């Protein structure tokens, strides 16, 4: 056996209870997120509340609650999610409609629902993402041949996404629209839908996006500031230029944990949407690449869990894993791309890292579902394998 083969055997989690690398990536990102939220929020917390650890303590509570919720989700069989997919979709749509009526407005967007007695604002779009994935996974299991052959079955989930998209645009939450649309199209593509349909739909989506951008002056301002943020660095390009300064200050190894200058009221949303810029400033390019590597590991293992489920003839579980991997991967990519100036500002959190209870809890729920799929698949595989004969029986 070669060295590479031995190393792969040592790193393999094939005979373990669950995918250990998925757990390592998730827990590492949550821990790094807590540390970075603490570092990035001390000055803002002092200014707003007089307590420098206000956001750190709250985020720590969110982390603990997320772990508890993930453990509870781990006990729910996939059969329950499969049976309740349509109901969960209705819950997601109801929350998106409710937030337009009774939602709390922050920075011009009505995205949050206040829950009496709980110091947590629920972000409706985060719950809707999960509900949509569960519904679509069940839909693909039931109508997979029709999705591959007929336009009607192919367009049905896209029509559901269109309804959600309209509700999200009214909030507005364009970042969630992009992530959820990409997730739906990605799941349909992985289910074997023809490429030609995607090319046509991508053209239509691009045309619609251009029309929406032109319709509102502030959207055009975001696009132009993204192309050249330095042209208006104290107005429309301010947030992006400050993020780029943070990346530049970090260089290779960073300024050191807690030594960020940009978090001192220069970079808005330093502990939420732009926490990755503060991370790059304090931990440098090495730290930033390491975090990107952890996200890549998480998405890879989620896809691997889905592939094992697909090979075990468990299509619902497989498509659920693919959808979760697409959502986490797309949201992480967009957030990092926005921070580095590759994409216009979207207002998306960085999963498992950014401050925010709803995002963290839903991300933990998704990981709990991945682990549940993995455990069920491994148990099914062990049941199918013939039991090894006992020593006495082997001799006889």
UniProtKB/Swiss-Prot annotation:
GO biological process per UniProt: cell wall organization; FtsZ-dependent cytokinesis; peptidoglycan biosynthetic process; regulation of cell shape
Family annotation (InterPro entries): Cell_cycle_FtsW-rel_CS, FtsW, FtsW/RodA
Pathway it works in: Cell wall biogenesis; peptidoglycan biosynthesis
Main enzyme class: transferase
One cellular component term from this protein's GO annotations in UniProt: cell division site
Record EC number: 2.4.99.28
Protein name: Probable peptidoglycan glycosyltransferase FtsW
Species of the source: Halomonas elongata (strain ATCC 33173 / DSM 2581 / NBRC 15536 / NCIMB 2198 / 1H9)
């Amino acid at each position: 056996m070669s060295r590479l083969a031995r190393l792969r055997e040592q790193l393999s989690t094939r005979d373990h209870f669950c995918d250990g690398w998925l757990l390592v990536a998730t827990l590492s990102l949550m821990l790094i997120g807590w540390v970075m939220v603490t570092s990035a929020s001390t000055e803002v917390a002092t200014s707003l509340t007089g307590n420098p650890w206000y956001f750190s303590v709250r985020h720590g509570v969110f982390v603990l609650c997320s772990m508890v919720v993930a453990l509870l989700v781990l006990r729910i069989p996939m059969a329950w999610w499969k049976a309740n997919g349509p109901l969960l979709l209705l819950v997601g749509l109801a929350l998106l409609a409710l937030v337009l009526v009774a939602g709390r407005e922050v920075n011009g967007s009505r995205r949050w629902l206040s829950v009496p007695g709980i110091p947590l604002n629920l972000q409706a779009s985060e719950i809707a993402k999960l509900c949509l994935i569960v519904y679509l996974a069940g839909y693909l299991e039931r109508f997979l041949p029709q999705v591959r052959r007929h336009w009607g079955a192919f367009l049905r989930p896209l029509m559901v996404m269109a309804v959600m998209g309209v509700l999200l645009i009214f909030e507005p939450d364009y970042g969630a629209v992009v992530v959820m649309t990409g997730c739906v199209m990605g799941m349909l593509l992985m289910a074997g839908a023809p490429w030609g349909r995607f090319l046509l739909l991508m053209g239509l989506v691009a045309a619609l996006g251009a029309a929406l951008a032109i319709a509102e002056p502030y959207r055009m301002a975001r696009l132009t500031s993204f192309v050249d943020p330095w042209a208006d660095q104290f107005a429309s390009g301010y947030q992006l230029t400050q993020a780029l300064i943070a990346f530049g200050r970090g260089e290779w190894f960073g300024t050191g944990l807690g030594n960020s200058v940009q978090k001192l009221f220069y970079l808005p949303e330093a502990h939420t949407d732009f926490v990755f810029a503060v991370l790059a400033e304090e931990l440098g390019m090495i730290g930033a690449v390491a975090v990107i590597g952890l996200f890549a590991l998480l998405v890879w293992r989620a896809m691997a869990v889905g592939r094992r489920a697909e090979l075990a003839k468990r299509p619902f579980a497989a498509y659920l894993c693919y959808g979760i991997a697409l959502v986490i991967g797309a949201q992480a990519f967009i957030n990092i791309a926005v921070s580095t100036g590759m994409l216009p500002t979207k207002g998306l959190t960085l999963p498992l890292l950014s401050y925010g209870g709803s995002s963290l809890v839903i991300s933990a729920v998704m990981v709990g579902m991945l682990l549940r799929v993995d455990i069920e698949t491994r148990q099914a595989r062990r049941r199918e394998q013939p039991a090894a004969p006992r020593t006495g029986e082997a001799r006889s």
